[in-house]
């Protein structure tokens, strides 16, 4: 079984491991799609180039698309012996130690930095610029390793944005998970 957590939907796929044949697949659109203007149930505007997701949409893929693809394929769940999962990197999620997303906690629900920052979140460009400036100034190897420029789409740009703009979220998060 393959599960692809995409930008607008999640897909579940069953493949016959003996033949490589695609047996069945299901596309499950995310309820909240890409969150770019306002958080769900909020009128507060998000800053430009924000791209967030709701981790509850990922759970819906697991609880709806996975059983549906098994049924569609007329497969016996006991015959599924492997699961591959993918996201586009960097998709970053602040969580508690047990993996609970911060945005699912009432205290953090209205703070955009507690939500999943999607790969195409470019609101951390200032942080990426600072990482690049410091990396170049000190001839850091990571600048060369990343093709001469660190991107706002990558983990540490998003993490630094959280540190600067939402230090309480940063302190409350016991983990920052890279989904990709």
Which ranges hold each PLM region?
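Glycine-rich phosphate-binding/catalytic subdomain of phosphoryl-transfer
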Residues: 39-42, 47-60, 64-180
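Gly/Thr-rich phosphate-binding beta-strand-loop-beta motif of the actin/hexokinase/Hsp70
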Residues: 1-29, 82-95
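Surface-exposed loop and turn segments in beta-propeller and other repeat-based domains
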Residues: 32-33
């Amino acid at each position: 079984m393959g599960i692809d957590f995409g930008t607008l939907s999640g897909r579940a796929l069953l493949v016959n491991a003996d033949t490589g044949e695609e047996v069945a697949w299901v596309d499950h659109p995310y309820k909240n799609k890409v969150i770019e203007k306002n958080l769900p149930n909020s009128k507060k505007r998000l800053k430009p180039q924000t791209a967030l997701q709701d981790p509850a949409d990922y759970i819906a893929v697991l609880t709806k698309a996975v059983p549906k693809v098994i049924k569609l394929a007329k497969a016996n769940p006991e015959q599924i012996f492997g699961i591959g999962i993918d996201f586009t990197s960097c998709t970053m999620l602040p969580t508690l130690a047990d993996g609970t997303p911060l945005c699912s906690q009432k205290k953090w629900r209205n703070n955009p930095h507690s939500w999943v920052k999607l790969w195409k979140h470019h609101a951390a460009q200032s942080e990426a610029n600072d990482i690049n400036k410091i990396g170049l100034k000190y001839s850091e190897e990571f600048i060369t390793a990343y093709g001469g420029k660190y991107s706002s789409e990558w983990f540490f740009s998003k993490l630094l944005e959280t540190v600067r703009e939402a230090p309480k979220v940063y302190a409350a998060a016991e983990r920052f998970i890279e989904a990709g």
